[in-house]
Regions:
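Short, cationic-aromatic polyanion-contact patches
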Residues: 2-11, 25, 55-68
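Short amphipathic alpha-helical interface segments
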Residues: 6-32
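Non-catalytic effector/regulatory segments
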Residues: 19, 47, 66-68
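Short loop/turn and capping residues at structural boundaries
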Residues: 29, 41, 58-59
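Short amphipathic alpha-helical interaction segments
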Residues: 35-46
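Glycine-centered, phosphate/nucleic-acid-interacting loop/turn motifs that mediate DNA/RNA or nucleotide
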Residues: 51
Length: 68
């Protein structure tokens, strides 16, 4: 599987987890989605570029949620 396909799969896994559990802190999402760190962040980037997630920062905390 090439890197673009792996990134798409990672993005799908992240989207599904957010759809089921709702918005959450980045650290918790990372713990729930058990994939390689670089693929996780590539998946986050993919979803952000497509406008499917919202990323908000509060101090050191980063919250990720789906855009409805």
């Amino acid at each position: 599987m090439n890197i673009a396909a792996q990134t798409k799969v990672a993005a799908d896994m992240i989207w599904i987890r957010l759809n089921v559990n709702g918005g959450m802190m980045l650290r918790r999402l990372r713990a729930l989605v058990k994939i390689e760190k670089s693929l996780f962040y590539q998946g986050i980037g993919w979803l952000a570029r497509e406008g499917k997630i919202s990323i908000t920062k509060d101090g050191w905390r980063t919250r990720i949620s789906l855009v409805k």
